[in-house]
Protein backbone atom coordinates (compact mmCIF):
# COMPACT_ATOMS: atom_id res chain seq x y z
CA UNK A 1 0.00 0.00 0.00
CA UNK A 2 0.94 3.66 -0.11
CA UNK A 3 2.35 3.81 3.43
CA UNK A 4 4.60 0.81 2.79
CA UNK A 5 5.83 2.40 -0.45
CA UNK A 6 6.56 5.69 1.30
CA UNK A 7 8.41 3.93 4.12
CA UNK A 8 10.40 1.93 1.58
CA UNK A 9 11.25 5.08 -0.36
CA UNK A 10 12.36 6.86 2.82
CA UNK A 11 14.49 3.89 3.88
CA UNK A 12 16.13 3.78 0.43
CA UNK A 13 16.89 7.51 0.58
CA UNK A 14 18.25 7.08 4.10
CA UNK A 15 20.56 4.26 3.01
CA UNK A 16 21.73 6.27 0.00
CA UNK A 17 22.28 9.27 2.24
CA UNK A 18 24.37 7.28 4.74
CA UNK A 19 26.47 5.84 1.93
CA UNK A 20 26.93 9.32 0.47
CA UNK A 21 27.89 10.87 3.81
CA UNK A 22 30.37 8.05 4.42
CA UNK A 23 31.97 8.89 1.08
CA UNK A 24 31.87 12.61 1.86
CA UNK A 25 33.70 11.97 5.14
CA UNK A 26 36.30 9.67 3.59
CA UNK A 27 37.15 12.10 0.80
CA UNK A 28 38.48 15.01 2.91
CA UNK A 29 40.11 12.57 5.36
CA UNK A 30 41.96 10.93 2.48
CA UNK A 31 43.08 14.32 1.17
CA UNK A 32 44.28 15.45 4.60
CA UNK A 33 46.15 12.19 5.22
CA UNK A 34 47.81 12.24 1.80
CA UNK A 35 48.97 15.85 1.97
CA UNK A 36 50.00 15.60 5.63
CA UNK A 37 52.14 12.55 4.79
CA UNK A 38 53.79 14.47 1.96
CA UNK A 39 54.55 17.36 4.31
CA UNK A 40 56.00 14.97 6.88
CA UNK A 41 58.33 13.40 4.30
CA UNK A 42 59.82 16.83 3.60
CA UNK A 43 61.72 17.89 0.50
CA UNK A 44 59.04 20.37 -0.58
CA UNK A 45 59.61 23.97 -1.55
CA UNK A 46 58.07 26.73 0.56
CA UNK A 47 55.46 27.34 -2.12
CA UNK A 48 54.53 23.64 -2.18
CA UNK A 49 54.34 23.55 1.61
CA UNK A 50 51.93 26.49 1.60
CA UNK A 51 49.84 24.88 -1.14
CA UNK A 52 49.65 21.54 0.71
CA UNK A 53 48.79 23.26 4.00
CA UNK A 54 46.02 25.25 2.28
CA UNK A 55 44.63 22.04 0.76
CA UNK A 56 44.56 20.37 4.18
CA UNK A 57 42.83 23.41 5.69
CA UNK A 58 40.18 23.43 2.93
CA UNK A 59 39.49 19.71 3.38
CA UNK A 60 39.24 20.18 7.14
CA UNK A 61 36.78 23.06 6.71
CA UNK A 62 34.64 20.99 4.34
CA UNK A 63 34.49 18.13 6.83
CA UNK A 64 33.72 20.47 9.72
CA UNK A 65 30.89 22.14 7.80
CA UNK A 66 29.29 18.82 6.94
CA UNK A 67 29.43 17.51 10.52
CA UNK A 68 28.03 20.81 11.82
CA UNK A 69 25.13 20.62 9.36
CA UNK A 70 24.33 17.05 10.41
CA UNK A 71 24.27 18.02 14.09
CA UNK A 72 22.24 21.20 13.50
CA UNK A 73 19.64 19.45 11.37
CA UNK A 74 19.30 16.62 13.88
CA UNK A 75 18.79 19.07 16.76
CA UNK A 76 16.26 21.11 14.78
CA UNK A 77 14.26 18.03 13.85
CA UNK A 78 14.28 16.82 17.46
CA UNK A 79 13.26 20.29 18.65
CA UNK A 80 16.41 20.60 20.75
CA UNK A 81 16.99 24.07 19.30
CA UNK A 82 14.41 26.83 19.41
CA UNK A 83 14.82 30.18 17.67
CA UNK A 84 16.10 33.06 19.78
CA UNK A 85 14.19 35.74 17.91
CA UNK A 86 15.21 39.38 18.21
CA UNK A 87 14.88 42.43 15.92
CA UNK A 88 17.74 42.94 13.48
CA UNK A 89 18.50 44.53 10.11
CA UNK A 90 18.20 41.87 7.41
CA UNK A 91 19.78 44.12 4.77
CA UNK A 92 22.98 44.38 6.79
CA UNK A 93 23.04 40.62 7.27
CA UNK A 94 22.67 40.00 3.54
CA UNK A 95 25.56 42.38 2.84
CA UNK A 96 27.73 40.62 5.41
CA UNK A 97 26.90 37.16 4.05
CA UNK A 98 27.65 38.24 0.48
CA UNK A 99 30.99 39.78 1.45
CA UNK A 100 31.96 36.58 3.26
CA UNK A 101 31.97 34.82 -0.12
CA UNK A 102 33.50 37.67 -2.16
CA UNK A 103 36.83 35.92 -2.74
CA UNK A 104 35.03 32.87 -4.16
CA UNK A 105 32.90 34.74 -6.70
CA UNK A 106 35.83 36.93 -7.73
CA UNK A 107 38.00 33.84 -8.26
CA UNK A 108 35.38 32.59 -10.76
CA UNK A 109 34.92 36.04 -12.32
CA UNK A 110 31.22 35.92 -11.47
CA UNK A 111 29.12 39.07 -11.86
CA UNK A 112 27.55 39.34 -8.39
CA UNK A 113 24.66 41.82 -8.45
CA UNK A 114 23.23 42.81 -5.05
CA UNK A 115 19.94 44.74 -5.25
CA UNK A 116 19.12 45.51 -1.62
CA UNK A 117 16.86 48.05 0.03
CA UNK A 118 18.48 50.42 2.49
CA UNK A 119 17.10 48.80 5.64
CA UNK A 120 14.50 46.23 6.63
CA UNK A 121 13.92 44.92 10.14
CA UNK A 122 12.86 41.35 10.87
CA UNK A 123 12.14 39.49 14.09
CA UNK A 124 14.12 36.26 13.81
CA UNK A 125 17.10 34.33 15.11
CA UNK A 126 19.99 36.15 13.41
CA UNK A 127 22.45 33.25 13.74
CA UNK A 128 19.97 30.77 12.26
CA UNK A 129 19.12 33.08 9.36
CA UNK A 130 22.83 33.45 8.66
CA UNK A 131 22.89 29.69 8.01
CA UNK A 132 20.08 30.15 5.46
CA UNK A 133 21.68 32.90 3.41
CA UNK A 134 25.22 31.56 3.60
CA UNK A 135 23.95 28.23 2.24
CA UNK A 136 22.02 29.84 -0.62
CA UNK A 137 24.83 32.19 -1.65
CA UNK A 138 27.45 29.46 -1.34
CA UNK A 139 25.38 27.11 -3.51
CA UNK A 140 24.84 29.79 -6.14
CA UNK A 141 28.58 30.37 -6.40
CA UNK A 142 29.32 26.64 -6.46
CA UNK A 143 26.94 25.91 -9.33
CA UNK A 144 27.53 29.04 -11.42
CA UNK A 145 30.03 28.69 -14.21
CA UNK A 146 33.06 30.97 -14.43
CA UNK A 147 31.97 34.30 -15.90
CA UNK A 148 28.34 33.68 -14.94
CA UNK A 149 25.97 35.88 -12.95
CA UNK A 150 24.37 35.79 -9.51
CA UNK A 151 21.58 38.09 -8.35
CA UNK A 152 20.89 38.73 -4.66
CA UNK A 153 17.71 40.78 -4.33
CA UNK A 154 15.72 41.88 -1.28
CA UNK A 155 12.38 43.72 -1.46
CA UNK A 156 9.48 44.43 0.87
CA UNK A 157 6.15 42.87 -0.08
CA UNK A 158 3.36 43.95 2.23
CA UNK A 159 4.07 42.57 5.68
CA UNK A 160 6.79 40.32 4.31
CA UNK A 161 10.32 40.67 3.01
CA UNK A 162 11.32 38.65 -0.04
CA UNK A 163 14.92 37.60 -0.64
CA UNK A 164 15.88 36.07 -3.99
CA UNK A 165 19.12 34.29 -4.84
CA UNK A 166 19.29 33.56 -8.57
CA UNK A 167 22.15 32.04 -10.57
CA UNK A 168 22.99 31.17 -14.17
CA UNK A 169 24.24 27.71 -13.22
CA UNK A 170 23.29 24.19 -14.29
CA UNK A 171 19.66 24.35 -13.19
CA UNK A 172 17.38 21.48 -12.19
CA UNK A 173 14.59 19.42 -13.67
CA UNK A 174 11.08 19.15 -12.18
CA UNK A 175 11.80 15.89 -10.34
CA UNK A 176 14.81 17.39 -8.59
CA UNK A 177 12.96 20.60 -7.69
CA UNK A 178 10.14 18.58 -6.10
CA UNK A 179 12.54 16.96 -3.66
CA UNK A 180 15.57 19.25 -3.44
CA UNK A 181 14.71 20.21 0.16
CA UNK A 182 14.32 16.59 1.35
CA UNK A 183 16.92 15.56 3.91
CA UNK A 184 18.05 12.36 2.19
CA UNK A 185 17.49 13.31 -1.43
CA UNK A 186 20.42 12.96 -3.83
CA UNK A 187 19.19 14.03 -7.26
CA UNK A 188 20.68 13.29 -10.65
CA UNK A 189 21.75 16.80 -11.58
CA UNK A 190 25.05 18.37 -10.64
CA UNK A 191 23.12 20.55 -8.20
CA UNK A 192 22.78 17.53 -5.93
CA UNK A 193 25.87 15.52 -6.86
CA UNK A 194 28.05 18.09 -5.15
CA UNK A 195 27.48 18.26 -1.41
CA UNK A 196 25.65 15.79 0.77
CA UNK A 197 21.96 16.70 0.67
CA UNK A 198 22.02 18.54 3.98
CA UNK A 199 22.34 22.25 3.25
CA UNK A 200 18.93 22.89 1.69
CA UNK A 201 17.16 20.57 4.14
CA UNK A 202 18.69 22.63 6.93
CA UNK A 203 17.65 25.87 5.21
CA UNK A 204 14.03 24.77 4.90
CA UNK A 205 13.84 23.58 8.51
CA UNK A 206 15.26 26.85 9.85
CA UNK A 207 12.73 28.84 7.82
CA UNK A 208 9.83 26.62 8.92
CA UNK A 209 10.50 27.22 12.61
CA UNK A 210 11.07 30.93 11.91
CA UNK A 211 7.68 31.50 10.27
CA UNK A 212 9.21 31.81 6.81
CA UNK A 213 9.20 29.80 3.60
CA UNK A 214 11.41 28.93 0.64
CA UNK A 215 10.61 27.98 -2.94
CA UNK A 216 12.61 27.36 -6.10
CA UNK A 217 12.13 27.80 -9.83
CA UNK A 218 14.58 26.29 -12.28
CA UNK A 219 15.13 24.51 -15.56
CA UNK A 220 18.07 22.42 -16.80
CA UNK A 221 20.75 24.67 -18.25
CA UNK A 222 18.90 27.84 -17.28
CA UNK A 223 19.99 28.39 -13.69
CA UNK A 224 17.99 28.39 -10.47
CA UNK A 225 16.14 30.99 -8.41
CA UNK A 226 15.53 30.45 -4.69
CA UNK A 227 12.98 32.72 -3.01
CA UNK A 228 12.82 33.20 0.75
CA UNK A 229 9.86 34.91 2.42
CA UNK A 230 10.01 36.20 5.98
CA UNK A 231 7.59 38.27 8.07
CA UNK A 232 8.99 41.75 8.57
CA UNK A 233 8.58 44.15 11.46
CA UNK A 234 6.32 47.19 11.04
CA UNK A 235 8.21 50.37 10.26
CA UNK A 236 8.38 52.90 13.07
CA UNK A 237 8.39 56.62 12.59
Report residues per predicted region.
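Short acidic helix/loop segment immediately C-terminal to the autophosphorylated histidine
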Residues: 40-47
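Short conserved segment of the HATPase_c
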Residues: 172-184, 204
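Conserved glycine-rich
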Residues: 211-212
